[in-house]
Amino acid sequence: MTLQIIAGKSGTGKTTHLMDEVGKKIKKTSKTYIFIVPDQMTFQMETSFLNKESLSGMLGTQIFSFSRLAWKILQETGGLSKTFLSQTGIEMVIRKAALDQKDKLKIFSKATSRKGFYSELAKLFKEMKQEEVSVADLENSAINMSKSVTNKIHDISLIYQKYEELLAGKFLENEDYLRLLADKIIESDYLNQTEIIIDGFTSFSKQELTVIEKLMEKCDKVTVSLTLNVPEIQKGLEEYNMFKQSTEAYFALLEMAKLNKISVESDKLFLENKRAKSDSLAFLADVWGNNKFVTFEEKPQDLAIHQANNRRAEIEGIAREIRQLTLKGYRYQDMAILTRNISDYDVLCETVMESFDIPIFIDKKRAMAKHPFIEFIRSSIDAILFNWKYEPIFQAVKTEFFFDVSENTSIMRRKADILENYVLENGIQNKWKWEKEGDWIYRKIRGLSTNLLPQTDEELETQAIINEMRNLIVEPLSILENNLAKARTGTEFAMALYHFLEQVKAVEHLESWRQTAEENGYLELAREHEQAWSSVSELLDEFVEVLGEESLDINSFAEIVATGLDALEFSLLPPSLDQIVLSDMENAKLLDMKVIFAIGMNDGIMPLRQKDKGILSDQDRDSLRAENSNLKPSAKNNIGEEDLLAYKIISLPSDKLFLSYPAADEEGKVLSESNYLRKIKGQFKKLNEEVYLTDPSLLSDEEQSSYIRSKQATLGLLTSQLQMYKRGYPLSNVWWDAYNGYFEDTKESKVAKQVLSSLYYENKTKALHETTAKNLFGENIHASVSRMEKFFSCEFQHFAQYGLKLEERAHFKLQAVDMGEIFHGAMEWISAELKRNNQDWGNLTEEECRQMAKLAMTFLAPKIQHEILLSSKRMEYIQYKLLQIITRATTVLNEQAKSSAFRPIGLEVDFGLKGDIPSLKIPLKSESELLLQGRIDRIDVAEQDDRTFLRIIDYKSSSHDLALTEVYYGLALQMLTYLDIVVTNAQKMIGKTAEPAGVLYFHMHNQFVQADKELSDEAIAKELQKSSKMKGLILSDPVAVSLMDTSLEKGKSSNIIPAEIKQNGDLSARSRTATKEEFDKMRHFVRHKYQEAGNKILDGAVSINPYKLKERTPCQFCGFRSFCGFDPSLTSNQYRHLTNEKAENILTKMDIEGGTQ
């Protein structure tokens, strides 16, 4: 029984020596030689053995990790009768333990619902087993500590004890195998006449040291290779020395040998760096960690430091380096990319390397959490827990497991979208609505009178789809909910979930996806679908094994399963023979590398600026270790480990080392370089930091040529270079050669033309062909006034809404249009009620106004947008506020009616099609017509002597006024159009001709009075009346004005209309008035605008031409902006700037353009 230690720094040939020695011995003896290496190194070590002639094919050598050796020995000696628990199973059991003890926890009771808490607990429990730290050890160490630490240890102890209780006698973890291995080594025949060689470790856990001790006692010889700075081995025990852990292992092994009377052979010491082929790399590896500052005087040829603007520029720079190295004879397998934070670079590396046609293997297990199958399980359970809310239901639906597996997927997706739109619009947010008896009713157009109309065939067809999809969801989900409600034990809960997955035919779905992926060449995706099912099956099996007999409720089950699902990962296939590897620095599985790219070498990353994370903080660990706990040291005391990690990277390549860092992250936040890079630049005086440029134009032609990669990927860069050329910058011949190369290949030429056309891109539309325009809009255009206003706002917006008929998705929320409908509906209902009872607006009392408003709201509330006003307490409050506004409006209209001779003769009057008044017909080119249709809020009439006046009143939920500038540009045509229609059709409506009295906006709102002193009730009433004054434009005729406000006196302003009478009886300049002639000109001009718009629509006008009036643009609330892509920074995309002018100037222009002059 012998111990020998092989010691030396990295790259001095320790592993090679061990392999050579075994190669010599094995030919002369029947002994077995067992190599023990870290878990992640077994595959690479086996490959090295196969490649070494002296060992290839030798049956007397075996390579194990500690865990694999444990499996081998326990198979031989017994001890594998207990079930092995995976990491997923461990975390589920820990969660069950924590939930059972939740009421007793002092610190962690809230943390039990925090994501990541159980994986951190699992790490701590693993460390406790590895370092042989018991709960009693922790409790004893914490006796004299602060309350927060003792409470934390109390909670850890409770959870750990319950966890051990759940596992007791039935299950094993990885760490248990090492404990059992130590006990069984002595019984093993397999270990007779063996030599053990332990290589690749920088430190050993307590468990591993115990196993090594037992191997020393059993085997002929144990050889341990350690990375040490041999000449200064005693210094290795200093606090921040990078070889501290190796040195501690060295002395621990010697101490064990001494205690067990094991003979110790002389150490074999290796001093010369045999790996590094260049002086610069050998020098750097030699002086790293040395406190003496030594410099390298020559310019290093095989060491480079690069800065990049960002991570993408960094990876693209490295990809160019790789391409150059392959031209010099290097293979991809000779190179590796190492990073501290692989999550910052994995997707980016995959994308960039693919664009350079560089095969890459990313050495990182991906979480399964985002796989549709995992998401489906999680969302389905959440849907039940949260009473069938929209979000979890449709997260589950979008995974497609509710779909009929035999149906066409595209058709099912379209049906699911229809269902989702219905659910969103109708506010279906609970189980009761989903399971409510009877079919859901679908109507495309919503409104107060919708329910009175029969359903169309299109509506019935959509309704059938909605109910078909609804049933596909409700049936399996209801059964799952019922089964979960009946379940009491872990087994019953697992069976409920399993039956649910069977019912939705989850296996068939996954198999179909796997086959499709395989047929299309996506082999990795096919394997993922396969793994998803097998992993979930194993998770449920493990759940039943561990917690099958445990009593659970649905919340505990959901939490434990969620923990298990979070822990699932896709397994990695080993890299192919010639790929470049991207790996995490700490877990890299690399041997015999020629070139290393160490990326992301930023401050705080290398060395890592540790933040307290995990269950125990740095302070906790330091305090516990001070009380003789064997826990690992805190992060802040791991500076030596950071230096050692950097040393491993530095000493890994034999030929070249590239170090790089980004100067900013994706959000532009500045990132500084690592202290290690500053140190290296200080040691290599002639090492110049270079930059990985994103724009190659400043480089030489030879350097620019390295930016040419695959044809597909080079196109983007070529386009940007040609864009610079267009602006007058010089262009290297490299890019002209690349350009010409695309057009030598017909296939590439087609793609290139499409991409390069962006150089001349203008975000402009082409006018539609006349036939297309007529197909879209009709030979005769039936349109509303608001549609024409939209056309004048932006032709493309009109095209999107009325030509393509695009719509924004409807949501179950109260919108401005709904409030407008309520206000209009209330006024219509009250007016109809007054007419039915032969009452007049002006004769109502204040109490009657309140009652009328209340009755109107009671009638309307259930009819507004799927009963939204009755859907919640919040909506009940909004209904109350709307009632206040309607009550106030009713009161104001009552007061105004008392002082006005005008009376309503029509409310919500339809014109056009089936309306009471015919359409306003506008003749267009080619014998076409524009037929206007719509609804007028209110038409008032007044008579005096032989004169009859008509006016229009429009109810608005926000403040409005009639701006003639907006009329002129076609943005506000509504009121004058309505006035034109009623005056034109006066004979039909009232049996006589009439004059236009004006157009007025009535603002429906709850007014407030602001005052700096206390006011009487009468003064408040007057102020409220002033704030209710209608805005608009009225006829400049004293008779008409006096009829609109019979209380108006000379020298006063009206509280009802925008009029003021001077002392001489004339209207003041502050009045908003127009003569009859001016009204006629405006009416004529408005018809001219409709004719202009109609002809342009038939001509196919679809320009992206939004206006800008002061700061107002139609883009502000446009739902099609992402579709049109309007960008004011493009010369082809500019606003139509409109200017305000004086009313008299506008009227003159209207007169000229309307053709009345």
Curated annotation (Swiss-Prot):
SUPFAM superfamilies: P-loop containing nucleoside triphosphate hydrolases (SSF52540). Its cofactor is Mg(2+); [4Fe-4S] cluster. The keyword DNA-binding applies. Binds 1 [4Fe-4S] cluster. PANTHER family: RECBCD ENZYME SUBUNIT RECC. Belongs to the helicase family. AddB/RexB type 1 subfamily. NCBIfam families: addB_Gpos. This is ATP-dependent helicase/deoxyribonuclease subunit B. The lineage of its organism: Bacteria, Bacillati, Bacillota, Bacilli, Bacillales.
